C-alpha cells in the first residue's frame, strides 16, 4: 500500500473517531494559524495611541499574502457571541521583520467592533482575516512631490505609507480636534525633526474646520503635488471639488471610510423590513443602511468594508424594493437579484433573505 493510500485510510479512521466533528476541527484548536485553515490571526498586543484610538498588533496565519502600504484588511471579530466584520487600514510597513501586521482603530460612538478592539481586546484573541486589498496606494515610481491631506482616523492608511517608503518631498496637513487627538503625533514629529516630512496640524476645536482655500497659503505648490486624501466626507467632497475646479483632479487620490450618501425627498421614507430567514420584521427609515437595520435587530448580517466596495455584504432581495444610498437608484426584487446591504436602504416594504 502506498504512503498516500495509508494517509487517506488513517484520515478516514480519524473522521470515524471524531464524528460529528472533523479532524481539521481539532487541528484548528491546536494550531489555529496553520496553513490550509480559514485565514486567522492572533492579537498579540494592543497599544493605546490616544484616548479613543489604539494600535492592534496581529500575527496572521500562514496563508497571509502580505499587503501594499495604504491597503486595508477585513477582520472578523466575535463581539458578545456574534461575529462582526469590519475593514481597517494596515498601519505597519510591508517589510516588518517579525511578520506581524498592525491596524490602528479609532473607537466611534456606538461602534461595536471599534470599541471592542480599542477597549476590550486582549492578547491571545483569535480573529478572522481576509487578504489585504485596496487601491489607495503609492505608485511603484515614487512621485517627486507628495501631499497627504488627512483628518481623524484618515491618517491610518497614510501612516502605513510613511512607515514604508521614504519620499524626497512629503507634506502633510492633518486635522484633529486637539493636539492630543492626533494619532501617531509623536512619530509624526520625529519625522519632522528628521526632515522627512513637513507637517501642518489643524486643531478644529480652536482653528475651525479646514477651509480648502487655505491650501494656497499652507502648501503653495499643492496643485503640482500628487495628493492622497483620507478623512470625513465633507473634507473629501471639498477636496474633489477644489482639485476639479483647478483642472488637476487626476492628481487627487481619495479613500473613504464611509460611502457618500445622497439626500432625497420625502418620498423615500423607508418601510417595513422583513428578514425572512430569521422571522424578524422591523420598521426602517429611508436613510439607514439595511446592514445597520439588521444588526440592530439582532440579525447575523455578513459585512466587510461597509462602504460598497468589497461586496462582503451581498444578500438576496426576496421582495419589495431598496434604494442605493450613493446614487438614489431603486432596485426591485426579481429572481437572482443581490443587493449590497451596507449601501442600500428600504424603499417601501421589503424582504431580505437573512
Predicted regions and their residues:
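Local cysteine-cluster metal-coordination motifs and their immediate loop/turn environment
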Residues: 157, 299-324, 334-348
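Ferredoxin-reductase
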Residues: 26-133, 137, 144, 169, ...
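Short flanking/linker segments adjacent to small metal-binding domains or redox-active Cys/His motifs
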Residues: 205, 285, 348-354
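C-terminal accessory/binding modules appended to enzymatic or scaffolding proteins
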Residues: 268-305
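A short, compositionally biased
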Residues: 69-71, 265-271, 309-311
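Iron-sulfur (Fe-S) cluster-binding modules
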Residues: 1-35, 353
Amino acid at each position: 500500500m502506498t504512503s498516500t493510500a495509508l494517509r487517506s485510510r488513517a484520515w478516514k479512521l480519524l473522521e470515524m473517531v471524531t464524528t460529528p466533528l472533523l479532524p481539521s476541527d481539532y487541528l484548528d484548536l491546536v494550531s489555529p494559524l496553520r496553513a490550509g485553515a480559514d485565514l486567522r490571526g492572533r492579537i498579540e498586543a494592543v497599544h493605546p495611541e490616544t484616548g479613543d484610538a489604539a494600535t492592534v498588533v496581529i500575527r496572521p496565519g500562514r496563508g497571509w499574502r502580505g499587503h501594499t502600504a495604504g491597503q486595508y484588511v477585513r477582520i472578523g471579530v466575535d463581539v458578545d457571541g456574534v461575529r462582526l466584520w469590519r475593514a481597517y487600514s494596515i498601519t505597519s510597513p510591508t517589510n516588518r521583520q517579525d511578520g506581524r501586521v498592525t491596524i490602528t482603530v479609532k473607537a466611534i460612538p456606538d461602534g461595536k467592533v471599534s470599541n471592542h478592539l480599542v477597549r476590550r481586546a486582549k492578547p491571545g484573541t483569535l480573529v478572522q482575516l481576509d487578504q489585504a486589498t485596496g487601491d489607495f496606494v503609492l505608485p511603484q515610481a515614487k512621485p517627486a512631490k507628495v501631499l497627504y491631506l488627512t483628518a481623524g482616523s484618515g491618517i491610518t492608511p497614510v501612516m502605513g505609507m510613511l512607515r514604508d517608503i521614504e519620499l524626497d518631498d512629503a507634506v502633510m496637513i492633518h486635522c484633529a480636534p486637539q493636539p492630543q487627538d492626533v494619532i501617531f503625533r509623536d512619530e509624526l514629529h520625529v519625522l519632522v525633526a528628521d526632515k522627512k516630512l513637513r507637517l501642518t496640524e489643524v486643531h478644529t476645536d480652536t482653528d475651525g474646520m479646514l477651509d480648502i482655500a487655505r491650501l494656497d497659503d499652507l502648501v503653495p505648490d499643492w496643485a503640482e503635488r500628487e495628493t492622497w486624501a483620507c478623512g470625513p466626507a465633507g473634507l473629501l467632497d471639498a477636496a474633489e471639488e477644489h482639485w476639479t475646479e483647478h483642472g488637476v483632479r487626476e492628481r487627487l487620490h481619495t479613500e473613504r471610510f464611509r460611502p457618500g450618501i445622497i439626500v432625497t425627498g420625502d418620498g423615500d421614507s423607508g418601510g417595513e423590513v422583513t428578514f425572512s430567514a430569521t422571522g424578524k420584521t422591523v420598521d426602517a427609515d429611508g436613510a439607514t443602511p439595511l446592514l445597520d437595520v439588521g444588526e440592530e435587530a439582532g440579525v447575523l448580517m455578513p459585512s466587510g468594508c461597509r462602504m460598497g466596495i468589497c461586496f462582503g455584504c451581498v444578500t438576496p432581495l426576496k421582495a419589495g424594493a431598496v434604494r442605493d444610498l450613493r446614487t438614489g437608484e431603486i432596485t426591485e426584487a426579481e429572481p437572482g437579484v443581490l443587493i449590497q446591504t451596507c449601501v442600500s436602504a428600504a424603499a417601501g416594504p421589503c424582504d431580505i433573505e437573512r
